[in-house]
Amino acid sequence: MPYILISTQIRLETGPTMVGDEYSDPSIMNYLGARKITVLGNNFSEYHVDEPPRLVLDKLDKIGYRVVSMTGVGQTLVWCLHKESSNTL
């Protein structure tokens, strides 16, 4: 999976940070220490960590992910990260 989206709401400095959806790579989620949760009323699961986004971004940088874009939507901040694939067609 070459792309990852992470997001946080309201408090950038403290977390929690949403790091993946139910289809995310389990090995990356394990590396981040994420837990899979389903919020009451939602019909999908998400992976969350208690760490702030900066620490998550640092961890993803160590395994080769780079920020492609970042945006704010209301009180939510979202980062899109990409990892170059070693498979070339």
Curated annotation (Swiss-Prot):
Q: Where in the cell is it found?
A: Nucleus; Nucleus membrane; Cytoplasm, Cytosol
Which InterPro entries does the record match to this protein? GFRP_sf, GTP_CycHdrlase_I_reg
A GO CC term? cytosol
Task: Write out the GO MF terms.
Answer: GTP cyclohydrolase binding
What's in the keyword line of the UniProt record?
Answer: Cytoplasm, Membrane, Nucleus
Highest taxon, organism lineage: Eukaryota
Q: Which family does it belong to?
A: Belongs to the GFRP family.
Describe its assembly: Homopentamer. Forms a complex with GCH1 where a GCH1 homodecamer is sandwiched by two GFRP homopentamers.
Protein name in the entry: GTP cyclohydrolase 1 feedback regulatory protein
Organism the protein comes from: Danio rerio
